[in-house]
């Protein structure tokens, strides 16, 4: 089905295209991907006749294929999900169907024992990529140890590894998979300071849309700042951190550490409040890299400084990628003399919601950067 004169869109369940088959109406599909919630999901709603399930039975694991093509914007994407939740409610003489699905990578929910390695944490992610023939990007780490999973699935274990990833006293690691099933394990400090492939967001109407994939127009913008302790990356600064010391065979408090993470806005070269509150899910036998405990505190601290969020509504879907570095034209402050000063701040695309219906294909984008707290008391 052609939408907006720009896109050829297909939504397939059991190889039946909901848009073109005529078996459903009021079809809406939203794809959610985020660097905080590492696994992409989608939600589909539509109305159809009561015999829809007789013809196309939907159960856990049913494949959902979403295709978006555009010659103008050089898009030829296919996203595959698997049903994890389904409901059908009577609505007059029709049924209202709701489907929630997760990215088609079941390996994330299996036991990850075959990925154990005595190497840097980045090699765990590289092994997952190679064994499952995935694309993506992995940043180098300096945290060699024996990485062995406990009773977790692969997704949980990757989150645990990322929380203890380390490369330097500036690093802040996180991982995610995007809707194209590409795997990423990134250092946010390295990403924002070394990236050269920068997307530029400009305010403008649809008819002003630039074909350049590095230029994206938006219609609405909301900017909000949250204190670090409320940031999604952070679980709070209070509490003490302890570890088990084999030499004395007792628990000891982990020393606070000074980090050299970079920020032009706030001072994060300070002690980490005697450690961040944390809990250990299993007994630690002493096999950990020398920065194992400090890494968890530093990762939380560095990531929590990214506490300014910008939400953009874009009327058209563009091939931007999660975690790309970008700039926006609305970043400025008003000085005391009334002059408006532009702030050339780099943002990271932290969330993308792709919305598809019979009349439009658009996206809502969330950007994040280090907080404005303390930068200026003037309006911005």
Per-region residue spans from a language model:
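Sec/Tat-exported extracytoplasmic proteins
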Residues: 132, 162-165, 330
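Surface-exposed cap/loop segments at beta↔alpha junctions
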Residues: 52-139
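An acidic/polar, Gly/Ser/Thr-rich interaction patch typically located in mid-to-C-terminal regions
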Residues: 31-57, 205-380
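Short beta-strand and beta-hairpin "edge-sheet" elements
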Residues: 23-25, 70-101, 330, 334-364
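Polar/acidic, low-complexity leader/linker segments enriched in S/T/G and N/D
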Residues: 1-27
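Short beta-strand-centered interaction patches in the first periplasmic/extracellular domains
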Residues: 94, 103, 138-223
